[in-house]
C-alpha cells in the first residue's frame, strides 16, 4: 500500500470535539476544519465557543455548535441527535472536556470526588455511547484526551489521575469491542501544554521548550486521518519526552533525578 499525501486530509469528514471553547479543544477543532472536516463542537463557555464556531466557518467548513454540560447524558444525547440531523454521520469523536483541582486526597470530599469522576470519566462514556451509533462510515476514530497523570503518580490530583487512567483502560477495551465496526480508539496524553486553564509551565522537559496546543492538535490530526488506520488501543504521549524521562529533569548542568 503506497502512502498518499492526501491521506492526512479529512476532506468532508465529520468530527465532534468536546470542550472546544479554548485551549486544546479549540486547537483540535480548528485543525480539523483547516484539513477539510466539518466540525461539531460543544462547551459550557458560550462566548468562546461562538468564536471557535466562527473560525470553523471561516475555514469554509460547516460548524455545529452547542452550549452544554457533557456531564449530563440527556444533553449529550440531544447534541448527538442534532449532529445526526445536520451532518448525518460522524467519522471522528474527540473527548477533550475535563478538569480538576489540586488537593490532597484526604481533603477531597465525597462531593468533590463525585464531581471529578463525572468530569473526567462519566462524560467520556456518555459521549461515546451517544456518538458511536452515528459512526456508520466504516472509518471511525475515537480520540480520548487523557494526561501524563494517567501513567504516573499524581500527588494532589489522585482522583483526577485515577480517572484519566480509567479512560486509558477504557480505550483499550473499546479498541477491541469496536474494532469489528472499523472504529479505532486511542488516547493522547499531553503534558507541559500551557492552556488558559493552567497558566505558564516550567520547561524541564527533554525537549527544552514548553508544548503548544497545536502539538496536541497535530497528534489528533494523525489519529483522525487515514495515516493511522491500523493504530488502535494506543496512547500517543505528547509531552516533550517527560513520560520517557521517568523522573529525570533537565537542569543547568544536565539531567538530574
Name what the model sees in each region.
Residues 147:
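Residue(s) in the substrate-gating loop at a strand-loop-helix junction
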Residues 205-216, 227:
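A conserved structural motif in NAD(P)-dependent oxidoreductases
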Residues 128, 163, 171:
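Active-site helix of classical SDR
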Residues 133, 176-180, 229:
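Alpha-helical segment proximal to the catalytic Tyr-Lys
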Residues 104-105, 109-117, 201:
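Substrate-binding pocket helix/loop in short-chain dehydrogenase/reductase
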Residues 9-40:
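Canonical Rossmann dinucleotide-binding motif of NAD(H)/NADP(H)-dependent dehydrogenases/reductases
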Residues 229-243:
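Short-chain dehydrogenase/reductase
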Amino acid at each position: 500500500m503506497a502512502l498518499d499525501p492526501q491521506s492526512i486530509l479529512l476532506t468532508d469528514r465529520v468530527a465532534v470535539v468536546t470542550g472546544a471553547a479554548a485551549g486544546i479543544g479549540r486547537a483540535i477543532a480548528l485543525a480539523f476544519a483547516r484539513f477539510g472536516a466539518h466540525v461539531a463542537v460543544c462547551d459550557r463557555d458560550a462566548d468562546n465557543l461562538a468564536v471557535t464556531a466562527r473560525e470553523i466557518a471561516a475555514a469554509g467548513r460547516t460548524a455545529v455548535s452547542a452550549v452544554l454540560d457533557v456531564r449530563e447524558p440527556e444533553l449529550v444525547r440531544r447534541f448527538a441527535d442534532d449532529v445526526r440531523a445536520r451532518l448525518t454521520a460522524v467519522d471522528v469523536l474527540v473527548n477533550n472536556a475535563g478538569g480538576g483541582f489540586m488537593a490532597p486526597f484526604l481533603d477531597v470530599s465525597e462531593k468533590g470526588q463525585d464531581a471529578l469522576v463525572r468530569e473526567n470519566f462519566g462524560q467520556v462514556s456518555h459521549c461515546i455511547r451517544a456518538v458511536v451509533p452515528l459512526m456508520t462510515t466504516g472509518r471511525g476514530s475515537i480520540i480520548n484526551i487523557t494526561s501524563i497523570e494517567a501513567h504516573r503518580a499524581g500527588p494532589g490530583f489522585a482522583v483526577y489521575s485515577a480517572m484519566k487512567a480509567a479512560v486509558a483502560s477504557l480505550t483499550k477495551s473499546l479498541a477491541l469491542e469496536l474494532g469489528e465496526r472499523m472504529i479505532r480508539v486511542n488516547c493522547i496524553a499531553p503534558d507541559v501544554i500551557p492552556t488558559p486553564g493552567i497558566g505558564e509551565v516550567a520547561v524541564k522537559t527533554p525537549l527544552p521548550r514548553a508544548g503548544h496546543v497545536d502539538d496536541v492538535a497535530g497528534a489528533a490530526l494523525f489519529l483522525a486521518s487515514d495515516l493511522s488506520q491500523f493504530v488502535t488501543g494506543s496512547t500517543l504521549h505528547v509531552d516533550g519526552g517527560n513520560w520517557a524521562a521517568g523522573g529525570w529533569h533537565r537542569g543547568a548542568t544536565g539531567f538530574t533525578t
